[in-house]
């Protein structure tokens, strides 16, 4: 028996039954418990959501900037009031430790919404003088109805990162959460409605990407798609979105990010950064620094410091506030990660720790994989080339700066990169040469609301967060005004 009642769709400011009659289950990865049956949206439901969004967006866009700003600020207050309640639900659905979801997931999502709520009155056009009797002015107008397609690793945070700039700019959004972790997006929809967002401005459709996601990307009344997920799926979404009606797209895709530790680095700090960059959220973070480059002279000392920190990781029940490392998000994903680990062993990477499923006692009922560190890795190994999205660190040895940067850039991905060094000139020189959209110097992982994030190469298109993202949820209308006579050539 499921823990929660059957979950419906959220359309037009309320829960509605899916017309398909079909459902799927969402599972607690810590113990295999069925959390809820979730209704699967049909094409008819997509059409209902689009029509609701079209009508709601007209009401929303007609409000003054300050009215929209106040409503979004009210939603921020509600999110913060219910932080612990939402965090508990996120922990059940994702398997992330409660200590993590309380401190990060809802907090960082609310921060982004607060940031954009404050920017609503600052959306403005330009006035461009041409001559004494003529000038041009521009208007930044909302796109209309947009769609967000989320990933399973940060369900409510991603829903907020996508909806906050969209709604701030006067758009309506239809959001499709991952079918692996769909629960908190529905709660966000409730909060938006309670805060005063007009009916239809934020709708949630649950279901598969192959069906619901595809129908959204193809719909002619949807003006933009914002997608977070794997690169192969992102390519399909982008192709469908552009071929159907030349939609704008934002793609936050995969990564295989390099972390370069230079010989002068503080190795304690470097080990702290490397462990956080690989094992936070059980390694299920798109920006993880999974390729760790260490200078040959420092390899043994660095490995010892990494192992010392891995031994301090508190793997356990996500509900236990002492736990800081939980299960992977699902059993199928666990099998995928274990497959990569076996590949690393087969290709002769040297295993320093982990490398297996954790099955002791109650852990055997969950999707637990031990924190895993491989060393003596080579650039052609599968664990070094492909995104694993799990707790697997690959340590690679280099001899000089040019070699490290060349090898760091030798990937189809370009999401993130980082360096650890006490030499400020070297830090900036290296960062400027690294082919990645998000870079860190002597730190890793923080993505504040003010910071545009997104990738180079096959890690994405466009950005999320920051001022630039708000602009991309608007379109510019240019208007020329002539105050003098009009001279016709005829």
UniProtKB/Swiss-Prot annotation:
Lipid metabolism found in the keyword field: no
Catalytic activity: betaine aldehyde + NAD(+) + H2O = glycine betaine + NADH + 2 H(+)
Residues that, per the record, bind K(+) 2: 246, 457, 460
Binding locations of K(+) 1: 26-27, 93, 180
Assembly: Dimer of dimers.
Purpose: Involved in the biosynthesis of the osmoprotectant glycine betaine. Catalyzes the irreversible oxidation of betaine aldehyde to the corresponding acid.
Similarity-based family: Belongs to the aldehyde dehydrogenase family.
Classification via PANTHER family: ALDEHYDE DEHYDROGENASE-RELATED
Protein name per Swiss-Prot or TrEMBL: Betaine aldehyde dehydrogenase
Lineage: Bacteria, Pseudomonadati, Pseudomonadota, Gammaproteobacteria, Pseudomonadales
């Amino acid at each position: 028996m499921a823990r929660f009642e059957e979950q419906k769709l959220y359309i037009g400011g309320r829960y509605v039954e899916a017309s398909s009659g079909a459902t799927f289950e969402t599972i607690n990865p810590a113990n295999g418990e069925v959390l809820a049956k979730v209704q699967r949206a049909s094409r008819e439901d997509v059409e209902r959501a689009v029509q609701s969004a079209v009508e709601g967006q007209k009401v929303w866009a007609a409000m003054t900037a300050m009215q929209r700003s106040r409503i979004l600020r009210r939603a921020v207050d509600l999110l913060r009031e219910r932080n612990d309640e939402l965090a508990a639900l996120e922990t059940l659905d994702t398997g992330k430790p409660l200590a993590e979801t309380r401190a990060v997931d809802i907090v960082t999502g609310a921060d982004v919404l607060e940031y954009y709520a404050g920017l609503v009155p600052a959306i403005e056009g330009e006035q461009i003088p041409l001559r004494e009797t003529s000038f041009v002015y521009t208007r930044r107008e909302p796109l209309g109805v947009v769609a967000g397609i989320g990933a399973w690793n940060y369900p409510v945070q991603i829903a907020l990162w996508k909806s906050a700039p969209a709604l701030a700019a006067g758009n309506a959004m239809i959001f499709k959460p991952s079918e692996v972790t769909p629960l908190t997006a529905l709660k966000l929809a409730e909060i938006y409605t309670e805060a005063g967002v007009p009916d239809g401005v934020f709708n949630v459709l649950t279901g598969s990407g192959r069906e619901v996601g595809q129908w959204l990307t193809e719909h002619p009344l949807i003006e933009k798609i914002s997608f977070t997920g794997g690169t192969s799926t992102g390519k399909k979404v982008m192709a469908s979105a552009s071929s159907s009606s030349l939609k704008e797209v934002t793609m936050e895709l995969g990564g295989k990010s390099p972390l370069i530790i230079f010989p002068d680095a503080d190795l304690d700090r470097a080990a702290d950064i490397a462990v956080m960059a690989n094992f936070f959220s059980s390694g299920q973070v798109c920006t993880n620094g999974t390729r760790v480059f260490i200078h040959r002279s420092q390899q043994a000392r660095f490995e010892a410091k990494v192992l010392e920190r891995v031994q301090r990781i508190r793997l356990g029940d996500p509900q236990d506030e002492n736990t800081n490392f939980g299960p992977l998000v699902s059993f199928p994903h666990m099998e995928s990660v274990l497959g990569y680990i076996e590949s690393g062993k087969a290709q002769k990477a040297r295993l320093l720790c982990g490398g297996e499923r954790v099955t002791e006692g109650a852990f055997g009922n969950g999707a637990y994989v031990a924190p895993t560190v491989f060393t003596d890795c080579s650039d052609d190994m599968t664990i070094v080339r492909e995104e694993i999205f799990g707790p697997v660190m690959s340590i690679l040895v280099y001899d000089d700066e040019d070699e490290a940067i060349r090898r760091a850039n030798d990937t189809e991905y370009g999401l993130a990169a980082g360096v650890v060094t006490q030499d400020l000139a070297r830090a900036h020189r290296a960062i400027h040469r690294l082919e990645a959209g998000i870079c860190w110097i002597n730190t890793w992982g923080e993505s504040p609301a003010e910071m545009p994030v997104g990738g180079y190469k096959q890690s994405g298109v466009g950005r999320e967060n920051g001022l630039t993202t708000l602009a991309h949820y608007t379109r510019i209308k240019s208007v020329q005004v002539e105050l003098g006579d009009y001279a016709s050539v005829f």
